[in-house]
Design a protein with these regions (language model features):
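Pan-zinc metallopeptidase signature
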Residues: 44-160
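Post-HEXXH active-site segment of zinc metalloproteases
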Residues: 1-29
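An active-site-proximal "capping" alpha-helix that borders the catalytic cofactor pocket
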Residues: 24-45
Length: 160
């Protein structure tokens, strides 16, 4: 299960609640990629790219203006998960060759990356783009453990 994989990835580590919440969002991104692998074989992607682009644009525009504080007093997009969301969008569109290299989504992802320098957007894009197609349960769990560790702890890969 997703919960078990996340717990395995974070065993023995102390992780902020917001990061833990983000790990579940990242797991949903992985599931979305697999669902889109099937969906995009039978349906056009003409609405998917604008949807991803508008969501990313809204999150980049909604980022906090001040340096991050322990307790945010006003709602705003979290720059860390916005950067991972940007990587998800890029990974998905690159996985299915949906946009050209000069598409606006790359500019938005660059802006998101600048707002969260501790998040390696390029590495997360690669992780999402290169997820195994039609993985078995073990492959999926290992990929989820790896991406969870990479996000929450900047950490190591899962053992085979």
């Amino acid at each position: 299960s997703t919960r078990e994989a996340i717990l395995l990835a974070l065993a023995g580590r102390s992780v902020e609640q917001r990061k833990l919440t983000h790990c579940y969002q990242i797991a949903n991104h992985m599931k979305d990629i697999y669902a889109d692998d099937v969906w995009l074989e039978v349906a056009p992607a003409d609405k998917l790219v604008p949807f991803l682009e508008s969501g990313l644009a809204a999150a980049v525009a909604d980022r906090p203006r001040d340096p991050p504080a322990w307790d945010r007093l006003t709602p705003a997009a979290d720059p860390d998960i916005t950067a991972v969301n940007a990587a998800f969008a890029l990974g998905l569109v690159e996985r299915h060759d949906l946009v050209d290299d000069d598409h606006r989504i790359y500019d938005l992802a660059h802006a998101a990356a600048q707002d969260a320098p501790e998040i390696d957007v390029t590495a997360f894009t690669r992780r999402f783009r290169n997820l195994a197609r039609d993985p078995d349960d073990s492959e999926y769990r290992k990929a989820l453990v790896d991406v969870t560790r990479a996000y929450a702890t900047g950490g190591e890969r899962a053992a085979d």
